[in-house]
Amino acid sequence: MGTPVACGIDVLRADSFALLKAKRVGLITNHTGVAADGVATIDLLHQSEGVELVRLFCPEHGLRGTAENGIKVEDGKDPKTGLRVVSLYGESRKPTAEHLDGLDVMVFDIQDIGARFYTYIATMGLAMEAAAEAGIGFVVLDRPNPIGGHRVEGPLPGGELSFVCPHDLPIRHGMTVGELAQMFRAERGLDQLDLKVVKMDGYRREMWFDDTGVPWHAPSPNIPDLDSAIVYPGIGMLEFLNVSVGRGTKAPFRIMGAPFIDGAALAAELMAAELKGIEFLAIDFVPSKSKFVGEQCSGVRIRVTNRDRCQPLEIASAIAGHLAREHREAVLFDEKIGVLLNHPKTAERLQDRTVALNDLWEADEESFLRRRKAFLFYR
């Protein structure tokens, strides 16, 4: 490995925070907002001469990244700096005028993982809208897309946008947060927003996170490592079904099952499908949190054998098809499959194992690849 990638915060720091001098700053961040030497962006801005850090904002999972998914996060105070912390995953998901009072600029420094329904990008988009309405600036400190910027996968939304589907993106979008911010500004009509992206040094699109030399900080409690992040855009899509996706195990999103599933039969069917870059092993497990706590579950363990060939949405579609055929009522398939998938045509065809679902998405993927070109920073 060569010289590590310098993330946006490191580039800003090397320039003595010039972009923020004489500015009153509101910082949207969490535990992943750290420089290469492990110093938190909060502390760097708070200690920087000429930068006035006024207020902190946190996303889902809170400032320290310890709150479980879907649990409201309360406002609070940062014990180290004494600054007010405004939760953007509590009573408000979009900053209010009162939250932005007295600020000149908002700064966003959070590690995303590259999936449409991972909520940090929804938080960024709503904060950009609020900043535009308030007439203040917005700065994104860019970070790598952990699962690579060279691949996109999945359909564009076929239904209404929401907090878990915040923009017209495929499920695996292959963009950094800085690139997405550029797209959001252009496509949401935020022309009045003074947006600046502090780009990374040394980043290339084909990089996986462990190619960058940037230290890994688990972006949320159930994405402990890169392997979980790689399969998340697929297995995460099954989250609202009545199955365990491995929360409360040592391998979240790499284990899935339920008490009523025959893990051996599911593993055999999935291996027979010869999906690229992946193996399935039958497993029995007992989740310690989320669904089926303390219950014996049967299902599969997912092992990535070639991440460059692995297609997370293909994996999820094969599993969802089995569930639709064998356990439709038990998994609440008709009621829940569309929540994160947001593509009725795919939901309708999942149960037919003879259908190549990738064909449904090919036009969406190609049109998105063309559309995103104008917003890409890195080759």
Show the residue positions of the predicted features.
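Conserved functional hotspot residues or short segments at active or partner-binding sites
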Residues: P252, G257-L360
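Glycine/threonine-rich flexible loop motifs
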Residues: D112-M124
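N-terminal phosphate-binding or glycine-rich loops at protein starts, especially the Walker A/P-loop
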Residues: P4-V51
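Glycine-rich oxoanion-binding loops at beta->alpha junctions
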Residues: N69-L103, A115
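Glycine-rich, charge-decorated loop segments at or immediately adjacent to ligand/cofactor-binding or catalytic sites
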Residues: G65-N69, V139-L161
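Short internal beta-strands
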Residues: E52-H61, L141
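Conserved anion/nucleotide-ligand pocket segment
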Residues: L161-G234
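Glycine-rich, aromatic-lined ligand/substrate-binding cores of catalytic
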Residues: Y203-R205, F209-F280
